[in-house]
Amino acid sequence: MGLKKFFKIKPPEEATPEQNKDTLMELGISVKNPSKKRKEKFAAYGKFANDKAEDKVYAPPGYEQYARPQDELEDLNASPLDANANEATAGSNRGSSGTQDLGNGAESNSMQDPYAIENDDYRYDDDPYARFQANKSNGRGSVNAAPYGDYGGGYNGTSLNSYNNDGPYSNQNTSNSWVNANGRNSLNHSNSTLNVGPSRQTRQPPVSTSTNSLSLDQRSPLANPMQEKRNPYADMNSYGGAYDSNTNRSSGTRQGSSKNANPYASMANDSYSNGNLNRSANPYSSRSVRQPQSQQAPMTYTPSFIASDEAARNSEVDLNEEPRTGEFDFEEVYADKSAENRAALDEPDLNAVMTNEDSIDLNASEVDHSSRQQQQQQWFMDEQQQQQQHFNATNNQYGDQRGYKTFEEIQKEEEARQQQEEDEAVDEIKQEIKFTKQSSVASTRNTLKMAQDAERAGMNTLGMLGHQSEQLNNVEGNLDLMKVQNKVADEKVAELKKLNRSILAVHVSNPFNSKRRRREREEQLKNRKIEEKLMREQTSQQLSQSTQRIEGAMNANNNISEVRERYQRKNVLEKAKRYQFENDEEDDEMELEIDRNLDQIQQVSNRLKKMALTTGKELDSQQKRLNNIEESTDDLDINLHMNTNRLAGIR
């Protein structure tokens, strides 16, 4: 049984970090002040470096998901009806992909409750698919309207669905005011349906039927009508009649063209002619009742012999027949024009009465004869002048039509040709000079842009090196504190070892050298404080030098003053005259821009050189600091290991 247990001696309580810090401060030992924060000049570049950093992992193909932390597993017990189900789903989607589809997000936020009571009653709807189109609507306010509803018949047609169902399976037939008796408009067939079987024979007011409709009715009524193409304009003849393919004549009573006439009516035998387009009715509808419409012609059947008699009777044309109302008459239209264009003959009119103007007045005076003679001379001179002008123009153009040219004419032509060639050569040189200048301007712009990009990258590199230097300074300061406190720990371990000796080993200090020991102790504390201060100053000096280097490289912009640029403009224009030919304002601007860009490129190049040198020096300095940090860390690690072993050996 030990003495400690016998006297019930307990070990002292472990001191907290705050108590330990206060104790060290009372003893005069340096500690770290957490409230003191150094101002960092390059903290923004540190944030920039963190944003640009990439977490690169290495994994074989197909195993990339194991190199990253697994996402949260989906809750299998989650229900769409939960309050936070949509938010959790959206959050997981954002976490996995980083983006969210707007369309899918809208659907997920508006999920339908399968247990909710339906507000719309579809029990009496003929269309079983109408509920899936309840949210759609065309421009006319129908609930289940088709998006491509009939164009011209939505307001004058008759709806056959008692519940106003205008869906794609409804039997609603609409009419259009533009359709003819035997045709349907192509814009009015989206929702119209026809019976597959033979149509009902109904009586309608007499309308003009075409031969095309007869030929269509002679077909088998049970044939598949969907195999034939449909021309929406086949039955709408501009003259009210139809075209007979056998006689190549228009049959029926011709009528005057109106504003509603169809210009495509002659295309009756086109491969896209209007067939009997049949569409099946809605198989789910029980109220599909077909009602006759006043504007649609009945589909009647006419025997072939009656059709041939009508065609033969219509083919006979009476040449003496008077033109009908509204019919185009060629003679009436072009009679006046032919009369106007008919040139009058120069033959004399033998029945015309002779006047005094055509005869010579023998009793006229000499004055009248002289005036008449002067007038004739004037006419003759004008005629000669016109002939001379025409003659000169002909000589200039065709060399007098003599078959040869004079020496003067040849010399003039040669001079004109040489002048033209010289002008063309000068213009070509001008264009080459202008093109070269434009190319030079573009080249200087591109070079300046690339130089500025390189300068920006260099500044970013220097900024990140500055932030790295600040972080290294923090590490060095912490290592200095660790060195000082580790020395204090060595002394405390030695003192503890001395106090933990055997109780029989009495240690008594020499009373005659107490003053000397006190002086040694004071010198030791003083030297320790000086050493600590020197380490701190050295660390701060390294940071200051690094900051000055980086700031000097980043602040060297060398901005050009306006006064210098104004005086430099004159010098540039004077030097540019050697390379200019008939220069204008545009040429001067290009010369100035070229000189300005070259000057800026030179300045950027100088700054890039300075940045490169500064970067090299900074890297060397930080490399030395890193080596010192490595050595200091190794020494501290060894000292801590030794103190730990010493403490373990004290019993």
Curated annotation (Swiss-Prot):
Region described as Disordered: 1-22, 53-299, 313-332
Modified residues (Phosphothreonine): 355
t-SNARE coiled-coil homology domain segment(s): 434-496, 588-650
Chain positions with Phosphoserine modification: 79, 92, 186, 190, 213, 271, 273, 315, 359
GO terms under cellular component: cellular bud neck; cytosol; fungal-type vacuole membrane; Golgi membrane; plasma membrane; SNARE complex
Basic and acidic residues bias spans: 120-129, 313-327
Ranges of Low complexity composition bias in the record: 285-296
Composition bias type Polar residues, residue spans: 86-112, 157-218, 244-284
Family that this chain belongs to: Belongs to the SNAP-25 family.
Protein name in the entry: Protein transport protein SEC9
Source organism: Saccharomyces cerevisiae (strain ATCC 204508 / S288c) (Baker's yeast)
Native organism taxonomy: Eukaryota, Fungi, Dikarya, Ascomycota, Saccharomycotina
